[in-house]
Amino acid sequence: MTASASANPAQIFVRLEAPFTDQKPGTSGLRKSSRQFEQPHYLESFVEAVFRTLPGVQGGTLVLGGDGRYGNLRAINVILRMAAAHGLSKVIITTGGILSTPAASNLIRKRKAIGGIILSASHNPGGPDGDFGVKVNGANGGPTPG
């Protein structure tokens, strides 16, 4: 099931979706091809799982950003809508959504956020034919267990 805010902020859509069986997080999150993340509801499905498992989502603060690769702005928009639908009170995003993993970890701790979502596939090449990743850090600024 995925919850996301619609164009009308008072309306929330709930979709029952079959799980994506290849969404098994690795060391720091989910890393797949950009094309996989472009499948309908693929990103939303993983982010839904994140919001259902991170403690303190309702009323909490989330840090969000990434390395600026292909797909980052779309992902940021999706995650922002879902964050609103899940009742987060604040999402901290830098200009253009550009945020390194160490900077995200620091912001999470300094702003006492519930965690952060970092959009990066690290050293893997980006682009439409490259890779995309969603890392999840907890309130301590470090990776959440997979």
Regions found by a protein language model. Give the residues of each.
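An N-terminal, well-structured beta->alpha segment
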Residues: 1-86
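Short, intrinsically disordered, charge-balanced linker/junction segments flanking boundaries
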Residues: 143-146
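Ferredoxin-reductase
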Residues: 58-141
